[in-house]
Amino acid sequence: MSGQNQGNCEETYSTSTHEYANADSTDWFADMFADFEPQNTTDGSYRGTMAKIKATELQYQAVFEQKLVEANTNLKRERIRVSIKQTGNSLQLRATLPLKPGDGSLGKTKKQYDLSLGIPANLEGLKTAIEESYELGKLIARHTFEWNEKYLGIKSREKQEIKTIGELLDKFEEKYYQTRQKTITSQNTFPNYISVIKRNFPLTHLATKENFEEIINSVQGNKKNELIAVTSVFIKTFNLGFQLDVKRDNVTPAHREIPEDDKIIYSFDLFEKFALNRKNTNISDEIDTWEMWRWVYGMLATFGLRPRELFVQPDINWWMSPQNLDHTWKVNKNTKTGYREVIPFVPEWIELFDLKNPKPLKILEKKVTKIASVQNINWMRRDISRWFRKVGIEFQPYDLRHACAIRAHLQGIPIKAAADNLGHTVDEHTKTYQRWFGIENRKKAFGEVISQKSLIELQKNEILALRMENERLRLEVEKLKFSTTKNPEDCEQLYHQG
């Protein structure tokens, strides 16, 4: 290569390396999910959540593969004699280099090698691989390449020193969002991951399979299952190279009394009773707040919504629109299971609970405009439970949702329609109403079936009686016809006399 050409080549390498080295790493991830809308495969169940995670991972992998192709195309176009290849969970640099020390290939002075530098196969790793490709290309162009610890893989092995859980935790959020959308849902989920790890694992312990499993196996039930789920995400995020060898516990949900309709209606009035009997408050924002929480209660009871589905960008304009003839509530796409339009399970409660009253809706709108983060939404969600306790309601907010699932079953609403309305899969919906289907609801179901059978029997008897009456009348008509045919003169005489 001439000195002039070599100089141009070096200038190309220098500029490109500088561009990649100084590029903000967030640029690599900013548009990854710009047009990505995963199908609403999650209903909050483990299977549904995993389906959505899988869809997101496939999107990430597609973007990664596209960027890898682009990187190799750019390297080739700029005549850099290095390419990048993926092997398992790592990226390697492929180049034709002088023979490695100890390589006895006869009759050769050069050979194609795949260099392992300890670079992970993700977008951040690809950025590093591109930088290393330009650096290696520069050495090849200058004929100054030498086999050293870095290219022999010695340093990469040293780099694989196991870090503590605390060291990884400091980088957890950054790594987590490199492969996931930053949505309201994910921002709500992630702080819980951090909290679970901090509460349960000594941060000074090494992030090894044995250390994780020792803690997980020391607890039972829901806590164990939560640790398995969170730790699995943690391990996968950092590609620690192992999987947990622990089994989830089978947990039987605690018994819950799902409220009957009369109790739901009675409890609605507890909000106003509380407001009338409470001590005076000088905080103007809190004087009428009870009306908004009563409205929230009514909506949960009527529609079977998740509490968050009332607070995440509520479409109040649609709710109050004259065009909303079916009184549906539109759940925002940024909620747990995505967009859906919900039909009221008990339409008459819209009027009974005065759910179209603009006053509580204005309070809600004012509250929602103050929401600056996911944390604010969580505060509002927790406030519902606090208000239930404050006014003396004896059940939990989610029990109203379970009541809708049971009610739909008793009403004979097709399972698929009810599941879609609640944002469930059919399986999850069936589990829900079967789990909380108590003795009173069984009595009601039996009573309705028996009542329907009694009604059918009554209708059958009525039909039989009508048929017998019809037969009697038919015979009377036939008898009359017969007597008329037998004595026509008598009939004529009777006619003239009349």
Swiss-Prot record:
Residues 263-446 form the Tyr recombinase domain. The keyword Transcription does not apply. It comes from Nostoc sp. (strain PCC 7120 / SAG 25.82 / UTEX 2576). The keyword Acyltransferase does not apply. InterPro entries: DNA_brk_join_enz, Integrase-like_cat_sf, Integrase_catalytic. This is Excisase C. The active site is at residues 306, 336, 401, 424, 433. Essential for DNA excision. Site specific recombinase necessary for the excision of the 10.5 kb hupL element during heterocyst differentiation. GO terms for biological process: DNA integration; DNA recombination; DNA repair; heterocyst development. Keywords: DNA excision, DNA recombination, Heterocyst. It holds the Pfam family Phage_integrase. One of its GO terms (molecular function) is DNA binding.
